[in-house]
Amino acid sequence: MEISDVLIHIDESVGHDSQFMLEEFLREVHGIVSPRFSMQQNHLMFVAYDSDATSAAMILEKIHGQGYEAQIVAI
């Protein structure tokens, strides 16, 4: 298992209930270890994932599939 992190910028502010629902959805995706929103900026999401099982691009695709416009932030 190789753990990697990705920072996702979601184009709109995400309310608390929507944050919870998106985090719960992503926790069910094979290879995602820990999705979490920034406490200070509710449009930024950090996702720890097993890069042997999934990729940042696949995570972004899953977020798009939930109806969010988002991009990977290079850090």
What is each of the regions a protein language model found here?
Residues P35, Q66-I75:
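Conserved short beta-strand edge segments in small beta-sheet-based binding/regulatory domains
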Residues Y49-T54:
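Helix N-cap motif at beta-to-alpha junctions
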Residues M1-E12:
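Short glycine-/aliphatic-rich beta-strand segments at the starts of folded cytosolic domains
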Residues I3, S38-H43:
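Short Gly/Ser/Thr- and Asp/Glu-enriched loop/turn motifs at secondary-structure junctions
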Residues V14, E23-S38:
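Short acidic amphipathic segments
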Residues I8, H43-A48:
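A generic structural motif
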Residues M21-E28, M58-Q66:
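Short amphipathic alpha-helices in soluble, non-transmembrane regions
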